[in-house]
Regions:
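Electropositive, beta-rich accessory/interaction domains or terminal extensions
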Residues: 1-141, 147, 180-230
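Short Gly/Pro-enriched turn/cap motifs at secondary-structure boundaries
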Residues: 151-152
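A structural signal for small-residue-enriched, beta-sheet-centric alpha/beta enzyme cores
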Residues: 157-158, 176
Length: 230
């Protein structure tokens, strides 16, 4: 069965190459399930035409909880249509492009296997992979799935946050090209494992050039817990 999110890409024959199939933006709104802030912009919807990719995110997009899901280190969030389709099978429900709050939905891109610190050319912008999406109570409230935080974390299909190295424009149909990869190889999936307590992976991650700066703040607690438990 052809998934709804892939229909347009299949029609154009574009799923065989790495590309953007949807650009998604959203504005903040109040919600009683939106954690302590009571407000969220997780509801991202596909937009037509070319969209500006700036240092702090996409034109027309809002980030409500910037410390957790915004700023220059997390300016853009990318998620693979293939991973969304995996979740379709797990959850038994349709998942539209943008439903996970991603700004860019890709096809033909191994986002889960992307390396921390690798750079992509997306449209006319250059971006760098900085880290995984860590699920939170707002995401759980939005999805309305039991035990969603744990389920999403355990799946190790978190999508990738991106730092914008060169501003530009992006639209559905634009190719995604890997420009460079760091010598130290830690994938998005492995970085999530590091976040949840793997000291060996965390030590490797700290050697990655271009990693998100937040790792330097997260690492001490992970390494200390590992040392205390050894």
């Amino acid at each position: 069965m052809v998934r709804p999110g892939l229909a347009a890409a299949l029609a154009s024959g574009s799923v065989t190459s790495a590309r953007v199939i949807s650009v998604n933006v959203g504005r903040g709104r109040d919600a009683d399930w939106a954690g302590k802030l009571g407000r969220t912009a997780i509801d991202k919807r596909p937009v037509a035409g070319r969209v500006e990719v700036g240092r702090l995110g996409l034109g027309g997009d809002e980030q409500v909880d910037k410390p957790a899901h915004g700023g220059p280190e997390q300016a853009v969030y990318a998620y693979a249509r293939e991973d969304l389709d995996w979740w379709v099978e797990q959850l038994g429900r349709d998942l539209a492009n943008g439903l996970f709050g991603e700004n860019i939905t890709t096809a033909g891109v191994d986002v889960t296997g992307a390396l921390i610190g690798e750079t992509w050319q997306v449209g006319t912008a250059t971006v760098q992979v900085t880290g995984p999406r860590i699920p939170c109570v707002v995401f759980a409230g939005w999805m309305d799935e039991r035990q969603w935080v744990r389920q999403f974390a355990d799946a190790r299909r978190p999508g990738a946050y991106l730092r914008v190295l060169r501003e530009g424009m992006v639209a559905a149909g634009d190719p995604v090209e890997v420009v460079s990869r760091p010598d130290e190889r830690v994938t998005i999936a492995e970085s999530m494992t590091a976040y949840y307590g793997d000291a060996e992976l965390m030590s490797r991650l700290l050697r990655v050039e271009g990693r998100g700066l937040a790792w330097d703040e997260i690492a001490p607690a992970v390494l200390q817990r590992a040392a205390a438990g050894s």
